[in-house]
């Protein structure tokens, strides 16, 4: 079997390994793995899923490839793709979150922020054990940060005194 491979050097942001083989390419295409999937992918027929609960795992796999988690003041979850694919994902989530990607007629983005992004990411990651670890860790960091922030605000409002009224409790919460 003729093949060609090219290892591309990894840096701190990305790594690429390229394998070219006609048989492998044809086999992957027969299973629906198409070139330029971000520009061509349509959501598969729901009947291919033995159980409808598996759809979120499929979406998570897609998100791991063409999604982004970023946070500053708010958490933002962003998924790039074709309008056909993202319309289906939007149907499972919230309306009015689908946008053209910088004026492109080929790619679109589904963007969630704040509570909607956290809910979307819980939908993807809850009780999951296969995921891109880098994105999962970002989700956990933000979730933990938001939990501590909300807990401190709740304590402050319930106690009726300043947040530093119980420094021992604050120390424990900060160590979570």
Predicted regions and their residues:
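Internal intein/HINT superfamily modules and their associated LAGLIDADG
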Residues: 1-176
